[in-house]
Amino acid sequence: YYSGKLEAYLRYAGIDHERIEVNTDILRDTVLPATGVMKVPAMQCPDGRWLKDTTPMMRWLDQQHGKPSIYPRDPASHFIALLVEDYADEWLWRPAMYYRWNFADSHRLLRHRLGRELSDGTRYPAAGLGWFMRWRQYLTFVRDDGIRPHNEAQVQALYGRTLAQLSQRLQDRPFLLGERPSIVDFAFFASMF
């Protein structure tokens, strides 16, 4: 989700980076001590400092490399862009997790992929890690986030309405805020990654 958002931005901005597939050992022994959490994306800068959380990461990277910036200069447009980014990051998370972890074909594919990635080079079995991640993601990010059979239709409708509005907005422009990508485009991309 957020790794896709960050990687899309890094590619767009032409920022040299090395994408590292993490396993449980890297998460535990490197990422956790450096960031305080066992989550990706996380990025180590050339000066040794670590960054986490895509919103502040992209703000910092944009200040260092952003020519042109992905943030609107006009204060009102800037505020709206941040508001819409927050919506895409925080509200479209639910439908994204719902579609990834609520359906057998989706969670089967993802549990196999995550099991392979997280166990690669470790002593842990891929199948076990895959099943762990499947249930962790479902229980934490679907069920515990409030998605239940009685409100699945609302989650589906939220995503459908959002896609319809994006399609309408993009009929006369290549990007959501105009002629070039902005933070808004990258935020919406996360839920579709």
Describe the predicted segments one by one.
Residues 1-124, 176:
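GST-like domain detector, emphasizing the conserved glutathione-binding G-site
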Residues 94-193:
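GST-like fold's C-terminal all-alpha helical module
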